């Protein structure tokens, strides 16, 4: 896995919403960032107004294969019965898996219940990529803590909770 501190380290953020966009803006201060979303109108509008040369707004999932890290920041809405809707996370994992290359770091920012990463996300990534977790690609988790209306506790001031499958990956997630 390429070190996060490498100047050529490329990041894709999957999901350009209230969680993804602040991450994109922060990462783009020092890295090339692909901002990937399936909403064509959103991508076109953001791309037309983009003045940061480090950000590429796209709906082409092939950008994932050009990335050293993929940050998953898709929504996890709640059904009327208070159960989480994991459809966006599942679809993101399939898309990432289809485009995943070896030695990629994947960090899940989407909020969901314990066990989803291990029981749903990793198997989908392996199935759709034919790669093996913790050998060919690496996974971390850092639940989003962004409250869009809070101007005091912003992405730059909140303490992030992070986890990973081993100390090396944890170190890379922390540097990210």
Describe each region flagged by the PLM.
Residues 70-71:
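N-terminal Rossmann-like NAD(P) cofactor-binding module of classical short-chain dehydrogenase/reductase
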Residues 74-76, 111, 166:
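Short glycine-/small-residue-rich Rossmann-like dinucleotide-binding loops
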Residues 78-145:
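Rossmann-like NAD(P)(H) cofactor-binding subdomain of soluble oxidoreductases
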Residues 4-7, 123-140, 146-176:
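Internal alpha-helical scaffold of NAD(P)-dependent oxidoreductase catalytic cores
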Residues 26-29, 48-51, 84-88, 120-123, ...:
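Short, glycine/charged-enriched secondary-structure capping and boundary segments
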Residues 65-66, 102, 157:
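Alpha-helix C-terminal capping/helix-to-coil transition sites in glycosyltransferase folds
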Residues 50-56, 133-137:
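A short helix-to-beta-strand connector/capping loop
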Residues 1-49, 56-65:
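NAD(P)+-binding Rossmann beta1-loop-alpha1 motif at the extreme N-terminus of oxidoreductases
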């Amino acid at each position: 896995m390429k070190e996060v501190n490498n100047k050529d380290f490329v990041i894709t953020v999957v999901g350009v919403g209230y969680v993804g966009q602040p991450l994109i803006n922060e990462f783009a201060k020092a890295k090339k960032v692909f901002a990937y979303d399936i909403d064509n109108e959103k991508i076109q509008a953001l791309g037309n107004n983009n003045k940061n040369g480090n950000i590429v707004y796209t709906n082409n999932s092939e950008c994932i294969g050009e990335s050293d890290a993929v940050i998953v920041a898709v929504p996890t809405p709640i059904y009327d019965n208070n159960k989480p809707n994991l459809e966006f996370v599942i679809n993101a994992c399939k898309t990432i898996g289809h485009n995943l290359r070896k030695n990629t770091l994947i960090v899940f920012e989407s909020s969901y219940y314990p066990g989803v990463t291990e029981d749903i996300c990793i198997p989908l990534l392996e199935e759709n990529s034919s790669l093996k977790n913790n050998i060919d690609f690496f996974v971390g988790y850092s639940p989003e803590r962004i409250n869009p209306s809070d101007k005091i506790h912003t992405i730059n001031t909140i303490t992030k909770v992070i986890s990973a499958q081993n100390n090396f990956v944890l170190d890379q997630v922390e540097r990210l």
